[in-house]
Amino acid sequence: MTPEELLAARDRVVPDVVAGGLRVLFCGINPSLMTAATGHHFAHPGNRFWPVLHRSGFTPRQLKPSEQDQLPGYGLGITNVVARATARADELEAEEFRAGGRVLSAKVEELGPLWLAVVGVTAYRTAFGERRARIGPQERTIGGARVWALPNPSGLNAHWTVATMADEYARLLAAVGPAGTPEPRPTRSPQGGSTTVTSTPNSQPGPSSSR
């Protein structure tokens, strides 16, 4: 990937990886330039989301970013607080986070996941106006979904290692419970992404709809 290709990806929107009735909808801050250029969520080599997802027990093996469409088969999905891609999250304005929180709330109500997991407590605080929020389960619910704030897997977040992040993600997994047996079905991203085959992994009703 050349620097020119990365720069050309600025402000690009990456479709969500979602389905109705997910066990957990993971929500990143916003797409990186690498994610926007490749179309694969958490694609930057320094991002630890995929290793942490595996080590915590959410996936039986470490998926590659290019395998993101397998996530709904495990009852998992990915979206973002802010849809547009930037080189760094600190390029975003506070109002973008607040607007993103409103869009995210509507998306969660539409899709009906059991849990919304925001991977970045600072982003969660800004998006939802909860300045005292800490890592872990939150009192807020959105529709029928409970909310958990997770540490940001970015390599810039040096306070958390893969091991300590995996422990926190595993706490969420324990709260979520075991996966059911999914049934594949076609879905379309609410952001207008192309139709893909995903799944409904639990019995909760909800309409179907990548980072």
Can you name each region flagged by the protein language model?
Residues 30-34, 83-86, 122-124, 153-156:
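Short, solvent-exposed loop/turn segments at secondary-structure junctions
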Residues 13-19, 62-71, 107:
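Short amphipathic alpha-helices and their capping/turn segments at secondary-structure boundaries
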Residues 1-15, 19-20, 45, 88-101, ...:
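C-terminal capping/extension of enzyme domains
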Residues 25-27, 119, 150:
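Short hydrophobic segments within beta-strands
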Residues 35-95:
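Short, surface-exposed acidic-centric catalytic microdomains
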Residues 18, 23-29:
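Short, hydrophobic/glycine-enriched beta-strand segments
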